Amino acid sequence: MHTVVLLVGIVAVVVVVAAACSKLDLPSPLVLIVVGVAGSYLPFVPDVTLEPEVVLFGLLPPLLYAAALQTSLVDFNANRRPILLLSVGLVILTTFGVGAVVHALLPGVGWAAALAIGAVVAPPDAVAATSIGRRIGLPRRVVTILEGESLLNDATALVALNTAIAAFGGVAVGLVFYVVIGFARKHVTETTLDTALGLLTPFAAFVAAEELGVPTSADHVAHPSGVVAVVVAGLLLGHRSPVLQNAQSRIAERLNWRSIQFLLESAVFLLIGLQARDIISNAFSTESSTTRILVLCVATLVSVVVIRMAWVFFSRYALVRPGPDGSGKVPPWTYTFLLGWAGMRGVVTLAAAFIIPPETPYRDVLLLIAFFVTAGTLLLQGASLPWVARRLRVPSPDPAADALLRANVLHQASQTGLARLDELAGDDPHDVAATIRDRVRRRDFAAWERVGPQGAENPSETYNRWRREMIDVERGRVLEVRSTGTVPHEVIDEVLAMLDVEESMLDHSSAERERVRGATAHAFEGDCDHLRQVRPPVEPDSPGECTDCQREGTTWVHLRMCVLCGHIACCDSSPQRHASVHHEHTGHEVMRSAEPGEDWRWCFVDQVTG
């Protein structure tokens, strides 16, 4: 019962603190640590001992799996060089660097224990770095590298701590689980069974890898890495989910793992703080002086920060890869500095510290070092990361540019779908094809409207507002029918679910529109010859209006301008689509946005933006 009360209390504190931080715009990971430290000194809060097995077998597999599912395998592969340099090279360097510092300041600890604590504090934490990084809007490439580093560096550190772990064995186990789970998912159509498979996968992959063993000598057995197995399985299953799962299963898995990830991540930060009292009291009750312990903790923290910063700048030119435009430019030094500064440690550091054998000299001091580095990096680097990003003027992902790319990709998908529809609609007595074409075009129009200016309400916003009002009264009527008891509750539940699905789509569209509001879509290099052509600037023939709409007495939504002749016409979201008509009549390939603050272009021939 004591354990149940403790778990309920942890979840309750997590929910309350997260809700308060959301209202006050505060970083919940840092606040949870402070709350945990304060709670550890309250008399009515029970002692919480963080068992290594709980973290390594209970928390680490689902957290890594959830992160791997959301990590793009394409981006991971494109950034594999910096990821490997950080997750392997930096962890090894930090292990020996911190080990040398600890051994120099505390000679009685011995080289084995000194290197062990070096391996313990070496790996940064995926939860800390990406949760704060995404919240403040770090560049996507920086977040991708941090995610990839954090997925692999735990395995590297645990290899350094337990030299029997074999990374290649972990890869093999992960591949086996990907094949087995992928095969099962292709034949499982029920969402609940698919969800159960997803929940089972990280724990099964981790345990299977850790239980397998290959004898390397008479008294030694090598084990595959459970961490690597979970990461490999998660990356591949996440990458292949559009093929392996149906739509309902993908939506359910996405929502389930987001909820699990939120609860576990938040609980991790609270647990870190709750360790404070016992770790501090045990360390200062040893024979070492208070001054020596404090100097050792501060020196280790400084070493961790300095070694990481020095390594990322030293290897900066090794981080170069061809960018999306194929330029191969060296990343800005500001990106490099952020990578160096975003090296917060987390719960794995504390859990690994508890693996150090009890008979190790100065073990309590080593545990305090691990806690001090974890809390210090989270509070020092985590709290200052938003300020550092602002001072360096590092650009956040542009919502308007994202909306432009989203509209372009959706348009390409729609064109492919309409081509398939033409093949299917040979015999169509009920004119179903026309209905489908109209819905697809309206979906495309809505995507393009989100790129437009944020002034008057556009047709999609009007539709969302009106339809949401309708759904409210429709749901009210369904609830009235339910209260009469004349209709089976299964039927009522199905109708309510249908309304919920439609309303959730409207809410998603509105949230996306709010992210774009106030942003500016900037130009980027297109990938067709028409967009790449340098053209002399032309003056618009009718600034601020579509003369065709004026003549016909119709209303336009957004305006476009032909880059060859300067003709202003309305977009395809407008009723008359005069920009497309202009292209059909003149053969002019490229139009650009004529809205204030926008400089993107559209090629009618190749159907791409630039």
Task: Describe the predicted segments one by one.
Residues P397-E525:
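Cytosolic C-terminal regulatory domains/tails of membrane transporters and channels
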Residues S259, R551-G553:
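Short loop/turn motifs at secondary-structure junctions and domain boundaries
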